[in-house]
Amino acid sequence: MSNKYISQLFVKSLQTQKLENSIAKNEKNTLVKGLIGSSLSFVISSIFSKNQKSILLILENKETAAYHFNDLEKLNNDNVLFYPESYKNPYATSNTDNSNILLRADVLNKINTNPNRYLVVTYYKALFEKVITKTSLGFCLFFFNIN
């Protein structure tokens, strides 16, 4: 079976249509339960392809988020972003992962500068880290002219 065929089955399902309606009505919080394996990825992918809004998908842990990110990237090709946490260990702030810091900055930059819609996949630990606001960053920047 191809991905398109499976996606069409999920698009036609009553549960997916109800979820699409709740998103169309601008309901702020939506909880999806009972989906196992890649079925969540197919449902989110079908909603993302029909919807003109960005989606923030918050999952339980890093492994689950990476699993669904991989699925969604294969199903949607573009505009799927992964937002990781920057620390390797929760309480060792000096032990940061530079590649994750770069990924986080790239995701935030794309969201702030591009008008495109995005499907951002993350997990709760990544959302708890503070991020500097654009206004605060503006106060900390210095510009030099070199002649």
Model-predicted segments: where are they?
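ASCE RecA-like P-loop NTPase motor cores
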Residues: M1-N147
